[in-house]
Amino acid sequence: MTTLNEAMDSMMARFNPAKAKGVNAVVQLNATGEGGGQYFTAISEGKAMLTPGVSPNPTVTINVAAQDWIDIMGGKLDPTRAFMAGKLRITGDLGLMMRFQSMFS
């Protein structure tokens, strides 16, 4: 995958409803730099819906360079290492972010 849109489509294709059981949250993605954009994923009742734009009240916000997000979604960059290196900045419910990875794997 080479674009942010492709990365987001790939993420949504891997959504596992069983792992999202009991989750009611909104995850905001702010991808910066060339090819960047903003999306939010609403997760509720075992379903996930991706929407371009900004959520007025996200549970978690992810700030990341677009290429780093593409690399994370493509399996080229480990999200934990990206977080530890400061490439992936997360605000809000960190516990949810731990589950987020398993919901979309």
Q: Which residues fall in each region the model found?
A:
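Feature captures hydrophobic
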Residues: 1-105
